Amino acid sequence: RLATAIDKNASKRLELQKIFVWIGRAKHISISDYCDVVVGLDKKSNALHYASLLFLVAAIVFTCVINPVIGIWLSIITYYKFKAGVDRYFICVNHIVKLLMGAGKITALNVDFLEEYNIKLKNITEDLSDIMKRSWLLETGNVDGSIMEMALDYLRMLTHADLIKFNNLIKLFHDKEKRIYELIDTLGFIESSIAIASFRNMLDAWCIPEFKNDSDMQLEVRNVY
């Protein structure tokens, strides 16, 4: 039904396709698989990350007595040690954030034949709004080379802010697991319906199969290849 409605509205289909292109895809990983892992992670203590901050502050405050390089060096070394273990999960969080933003773009279009899904997406994005609020410092590999991005990168290395935020996000992911999968399923259904509508437009003819509970089953097709 949704594919048929999309098929009849070429302009809306194009607008929706642009949003899904903007969302993109996560290369080399399955977001749903990583979501399974993320929600199953145990929340780790941030004690070491806060300790690194204290070392850095102490090195700066007592710069006349202690070489500040020691505090900076310790912060960076411990940062990369822990970052290597969770980097792939950062990508997962970032993609979920993009899905949430994409859901917002779709509902903003106010497409009439998506009314049922718009209501669902609005409820989901409201429930998952904390994920967007808490994930802004997470670096995901999409570095654009800007001065702002470079400054944030140094901030992350020195303060471990992204690692601290990620540890705090783990519990939120666990609590909102059902809603996260509802988001993935709903957007996936809309995108698959767009794909069906687009494929139909490529064909000279197509049909919708009719299933019957008949004891005398027969299959008859023509011009099939």
Q: What are these regions, as identified by a protein language model?
A:
Residues 1-225:
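Alpha-helical coupling/stalk and coiled-coil linker elements that connect catalytic or binding modules
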